[in-house]
Each structure stands twice: as C-alpha cells, then as structure tokens.
C-alpha cells in the first residue's frame, strides 16, 4: 500500500476520424522494432505479489480517473518498462478467483518483480483485504475492449511540439510512428505514457502507425495536433488466437 500521486482529470472533446485505418501484420519489416526487453509475452505466467491502494484509475500512465471501472493496477517499477505496459491487461489468479485488471500506474514502492498494487475493490475480489499482501501468479492477456483504438493529443501540443497517447487498445502498444516526407518516423515514448515528438509533427493532418507487441499494425490519420483532443481510430488489434 502506498500514497498515490494523482494526475488531475481533464475534460476531453471526442472527434471521430472520418477515414483511413488499416490493420495487419507487417510483412516487409516496416512495422518492426516492436520487441521490448523485459516485457512478458502474452499468456506467460509470472509469480508475484498483490497489495492494494486507493486507486482512481489515474496515475503515471496519464489516464483520466475511471470511477466506473476500478479493476486497475499499478505495475512494479522494474516491469513498468518506461510506461510500455500502460493500458495493457493482466489476469491474476488469487485465492478467491481470477480477475483481469488494466495497468494504469507504476508503483515505485514495489521493488520486486511480479508485484502488482491493485485498487482496493479489485484486491477484494480475489483476496481478503485483511491479509494485505498475498502471493499470486498472473499473466499478460488481451484487454476486453470494444470499438477501435483512440488517440489523445496531450494538452499543450501543437504543430511545434506534439504528444500522442494511444488508448483503448486490446494488445500492448510497443511503438508509434508518424509519416514525414514519405517516411515513417519512430517517436519516443516517455515514462508518463505519451509518444512525444519534441519538434512537432507539423501542420495539418498526421498519419499515425502503431505497433502491438505481436507485430500487428494499425494506421490512422489524425486531423491535426489539436491540444487536449481525443480522436477515435478506425480499427482495433485482433485478439490472439490462443485465447489469451
């Protein structure tokens, strides 16, 4: 259990993308580079420990509070992987049953590999809160999402400094690129879960390509780098065939 650092929620305007989206595995290597060292493959079990804190759904992953869904967790600092696990899901096997939670935060006070800090309500679904610290095992799984992925343009963004966050993704997102002068440009992901282009992505429409952990890619075109806007994409990553 720990003291949570909250990031204030923001009102978002949602704009539907009127166009182009493509989904598929990259066959020519152009969508490669999706491997992140230390990231568990989907379905691979990890022995671990669960604790709980006063989670709101917000945190270091820079998501808004989600009072309607608090099946959320903070990842131990070693497996947070500079926010690469943000928005991904894990299934936990606890004494009282199984539960799928979404990673929304990091836990700097959780030094051990496998440690997950859950919301109070999530913890109570699979273990007795009186126990406080419970040994479990868990595995990364696909998130049970509906609809397409979405893209949040961070407040303060413009054509000269652009930060994009991918939301509502079924699989872990490992890479984001944008199209510049006919070529895809890899964008660095920051620890607060935004892909940031410090020189900006330019004026007008922005072509985006995101890559999932398994190599699938999605392409969308955003109307522009409008500060604090949420744009709906055109498609979603396919669920893995193994049922994870």
PLM feature segments, named:
Residues 1-12:
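Bacterial N-terminal signal peptides that target proteins for export
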Residues 16-17, 54:
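Residue-level signal for mature regions of secreted extracellular proteins and peptides
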Residues 19-22:
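C-terminal motif of bacterial Sec signal peptides marking the signal peptidase cleavage site
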Residues 24-214, 219-244:
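Secreted/periplasmic proteins
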């Amino acid at each position: 259990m720990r003291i949570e650092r909250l990031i204030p929620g923001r009102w978002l305007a949602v704009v539907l993308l009127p166009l182009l989206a493509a989904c598929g595995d990259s066959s020519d290597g152009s969508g490669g580079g999706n491997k992140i060292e230390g990231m568990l493959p989907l379905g691979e079990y990890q022995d671990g420990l669960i604790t709980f804190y006063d989670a709101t759904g917000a945190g270091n992953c820079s998501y808004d509070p989600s009072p309607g869904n608090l099946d959320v967790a903070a990842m131990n600092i070693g497996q947070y992987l500079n926010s690469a696990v943000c928005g991904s899901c894990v299934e936990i096997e606890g004494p009282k049953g199984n539960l799928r939670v979404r990673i929304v935060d990091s836990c700097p006070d959780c030094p051990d590999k496998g440690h997950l800090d859950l919301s109070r309500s999530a913890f109570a679904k699979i273990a007795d809160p009186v126990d406080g610290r419970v040994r479990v095992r868990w595995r990364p799984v696909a998130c049970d999402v509906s609809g397409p992925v979405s893209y949040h343009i961070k407040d303060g963004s413009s054509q000269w400094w652009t930060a994009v966050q991918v939301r509502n993704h079924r699989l872990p997102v490992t890479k984001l690129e944008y199209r510049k002068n006919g070529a895809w440009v890899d964008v660095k992901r920051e620890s607060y879960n935004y892909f940031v282009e410090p020189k900006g992505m330019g004026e007008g429409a922005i072509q985006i390509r995101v890559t999932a952990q398994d190599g699938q890619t999605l392409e969308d075109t955003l109307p522009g780098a409008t500060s604090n806007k949420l744009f709906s994409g055109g498609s979603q990553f396919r669920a893995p065939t193994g049922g994870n």
